Amino acid sequence: MQNDIKTERLILHEMTAADWAEYVAHVTEADELFVQYGIEPDERLIEFIKEPTIGVLYRSIALRDTGETVGYIGVYEEEDNLEFYVFREYRRRHYCSEEVGAFIKAYLSGVLTGTLHDRVIAETLWENGPAAEMLKRVGFVSDAVGFKLSENRENNITGTWRLKYE
């Protein structure tokens, strides 16, 4: 398929409605919504994520050898803001760093959009330190530390790291 991104173990292909439904099924499992969005899940959030966000260029991540979906990656092109998610059962296998590295190279070079981009921004919750460390391994640098108001398990403020790749 046009604009597929291939790595040694993965294929990042255009996301289908079935791929998005699989993501929703995984992320609505216990504790996954908090990890992904930083807020306690409720019916409004679950309803909100049933449709992909408008303006985000999504790719589904599949294993090259089996075609099995392991997560997704996307970028909100207007802000060059990266988002990604690997299903729980596929974590700690370095799929995330493999997908992020390949995706940002394709995005920055214009392969995905026909437009060159000069940066990618990623934000992650303090509670998700492994994501920040992975982003640093693929070349992101810390850009800012902040807070966002949300319903955290302990209080109403969640810390965030903002990282940048140029």
Language-model features: locations:
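PAS/PAS-like sensory domains
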Residues: T53-L57
